[in-house]
Amino acid sequence: MNAPKLADPIVLAHGMLGLMQGLVSGARMENYFRGIPDWLRKAGNEVIVTHVPGIGSIARRAEMLKQGILASTNRTVHLIGHSQGGLDARHMITHLDMAECVRSLTTIGTPHRGSPIADWGVSTAGKAGIFQLIETTSLDTQAFLDLRTENMAAFNESTPDMKDVRYYSVTGVGNPKKMIATLRWCHKYIEKHEGANDGLVSTASAEWGEEVTEWPADHANQIGLFCGDHFDWKSHWADMLSRLQSSS
């Protein structure tokens, strides 16, 4: 299936690289989205794959996202952010004077209302696991703190949508039997606290904007990883891009 061609450049904003390294051996910034950039370019799209700190606060990553976009184009863009990349984009648009540069923002599997995994990570029990691992490896712990549910509530209150930007979102509901082990454990934990989820982000947390689409995909499937024959990422990405095409 071919990708629809958009009139404006497409910017891809990645999520936590440290997380993806844990899920996918050898994951690097340039292949976070795997075959998606090439697929988009084959249809004639101008594609900008941004590079921001793999583990960093929303504010820090948003600054780098802005720099990456302005260094690549002077045209308005369609932004697509996966996971934390969607939060970086929202911060950038609202707080860094980038609303005039962005035609639309589509977030995929983005924890707009935080994550119970982040809450657990800074709890007494979690500090012996995830949070301690981040601290001992000298990574930016603010990234994890930003995603706590109470901190995201404050973020949402201080980061309103901008009126001239179209906001869309994609949520995911993954099949735990098809998930890799890490996502399977997280899926069970999140399901207990927030219900349906993609193995890292609940559908309730991922909903944002004027139109919400649900994919039968886990957090990795959404960017073309471990799809097998149970999720056709090209078909779903094509539908998403067709919506942007019609709203331009």
What are these language model-derived features?
Residues 4-75:
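Active-site catalytic motif of lipid deacylating hydrolases and related acyltransferases
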Residues 11, 48, 106, 168-170, ...:
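Hydrophobic/aromatic beta-strand patches that form the interior of the parallel beta-sheet core
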Residues 14-16, 21, 82-83, 110, ...:
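Glycine-rich His-Gly loop
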Residues 23-25, 115-121, 126, 178-183:
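Short aromatic-enriched loop/helix-cap "lid" or pocket-rim segments at secondary-structure transitions
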Residues 59-159, 198:
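Serine-dependent carboxylesterase/thioesterase catalytic core
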Residues 161-248:
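C-terminal catalytic-base region of ester-bond hydrolases, centering on the histidine
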